[in-house]
Amino acid sequence: MESLEKVEDYIIRWLNDYADKSNMKGFVVGISGGIDSALTSTLCAMTGKALLCLEMPIKQVENQLIRSSKHIKWLEAKFRNVRSIRLNLDSVFDSFCSVLPESKYRDAHELSLANTRARLRMSSLYYFAALNKYLVVGTGNKVEDFGVGFYTKYGDGGVDLSPIADISKTQVFK
């Protein structure tokens, strides 16, 4: 197995090459507070290119945002190319829900709303990417997103590139 440093260097070079060939200035990553978004955003920051970290809470209590906020503060302290925005999407989500018809299928309704949250976040990531000439970077790992398929189509799966797509969850934790 390749050393973690070699994998890290390869991904950083790949991100830089991808951005350069795409004529893009940097990256935008949605920060959830989980290990995958922490690793992905750190790798993007290590490229030296501009990185925008977006926190996009939807119906979340403040203590659910602590890990994402701490990680972003750490990134901003360590890397000068990092900036962040917290974009509260509660009102957008509420507005969308207010025009939906009643559903008698409670489980399907809840799953649909969970996927809607992911799609609102994806739209927000692409808004900021277009404004800044950035690439939207996915945080999916090999097992969850690209093995099991645990993602929302046209939501958190709707990205320009996925730098940790070949890394297992075990490797992510290392």
Could you tell me what each predicted segment is?
Residues G157:
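Residues forming the flavin
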Residues M1-T152, L161, A165:
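ATP-dependent adenylation/nucleotidyltransferase module used to activate substrates
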Residues S168-K174:
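Metal-dependent de-N-acetylase/amidase catalytic core
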